[in-house]
C-alpha cells in the first residue's frame, strides 16, 4: 500500500482566538484523496466533542423578551452574545460561571468567573454595556456535547422560569475545506493525488488535535470491519437525528433564501433533507447562490444532500 506523508504547511491564530491549519496529505492513489477528504470533513464538522454555553440566568429576568434597566442590550442580545462565547470545559459535568458588575462597565466574556475546569477562549467578546449606577448579574451554564442541541422546553430539569435556555452548538470546528491536486511521482510518470485540507477551529482545540481526533474516530468506526462475523442481528429502527428537528430559522439564511424556502413549504432541516441540489434550483426564484448558501448551512451542522436526484 502506498505510504503517504502529512505536513502542516500553515497555522494561524486570529484576533478572536480561532485557529486555522492547512495540511498536505500525499501522495495518494487515485480516488483516495476524495475518500479521505470527505470522511475527515464529515467527522470534523459533526463528530467532535466540544463545549458550549447552554443556558443563562439573569437576575430579575424571567423571559427572553425582557429589557434590563441601565443595560444597553436587551435580553435577546445578551443571550446571543453568550451563545457566541468560545469555551473549553475539561469537565463532563455542568459547569456554572457567574458575573456581577456595577456600571459603568463594558462587560466582556473574560469577566465571567468559572472554575479552573473552564477556559474562556475569546475573552474580549462583548456581553453587555452597563450604565453608571446600575447592576448586572449573570449565571452562565457550560456543558460538553457533540453537534447541535436545540432547546428542550419539555424537560422539567431545564425549564425553570428564570433559566433561559440556549440552542447549543458544541462543534469546535467552524469550517473545513479541501482540494485535490494531481501530481506525477511514481516511476513512469503515473499519476498520484495530494489532498490539501484547511480547517478552522473556534480556538477551543488546535487544528492538529482536531484532525487527529477525527482520524481516531474513523479508525474506531472501521476497525470492527476487519473482523466481520456472520451473526445475524435484528436491525434497530433508526431514531431521527436531532439536527433534523432544527427549524429553518436557525440556519441563519439570507432573507431571499429563507422566504423562497418558506413558500416551498420547507420549515425545518428535516424537510431540506428530502431535496437534492437540483431540486433546490427548481424552487421558484431560487438561484445557485441561494442553493450554495443552503448547502453550506447544512454542512455546518454535519448534514449533506446529493447533487442530483439520481445520486440520492
Curated annotation (Swiss-Prot):
Does the keyword Manganese belong to this entry? no
- Which controlled-vocabulary keywords does the entry list? DNA-directed RNA polymerase, Nucleotidyltransferase, Transcription, Transferase
Q: Does the keyword Transferase apply?
A: yes
Which EC main class describes this enzyme?
transferase
Which GO terms fall under molecular function for this chain's record? DNA binding; DNA-directed RNA polymerase activity; protein dimerization activity
Q: Which SUPFAM superfamilies does this one have?
A: C-terminal domain of RNA polymerase alpha subunit, Insert subdomain of RNA polymerase alpha subunit, RBP11-like subunits of RNA polymerase
What Pfam families does this protein's entry cite?
Answer: RNA_pol_A_bac, RNA_pol_A_CTD, RNA_pol_L
The UniProt entry, under InterPro entries, shows: DNA-dir_RNA_pol_insert, DNA-dir_RNA_pol_RpoA/D/Rpb3, DNA-dir_RpoA, RBP11-like, RNAP_asu_C, RNApol_insert_sf
Residue span of region Alpha C-terminal domain (alpha-CTD) = 239-312
Q: Where is this region: Alpha N-terminal domain (alpha-NTD)?
A: 1-229
* Family as reported in the entry's similarity comment: Belongs to the RNA polymerase alpha chain family.
Its subunit composition reads: In cyanobacteria the RNAP catalytic core is composed of 2 alpha, 1 beta, 1 beta', 1 gamma and 1 omega subunit. When a sigma factor is associated with the core the holoenzyme is formed, which can initiate transcription.
Entry note about domains: The N-terminal domain is essential for RNAP assembly and basal transcription, whereas the C-terminal domain is involved in interaction with transcriptional regulators and with upstream promoter elements.
- Role summary: DNA-dependent RNA polymerase catalyzes the transcription of DNA into RNA using the four ribonucleoside triphosphates as substrates.
Fetch the HAMAP family from UniProt: RNApol_bact_RpoA
Q: This chain belongs to which protein, by name?
A: DNA-directed RNA polymerase subunit alpha
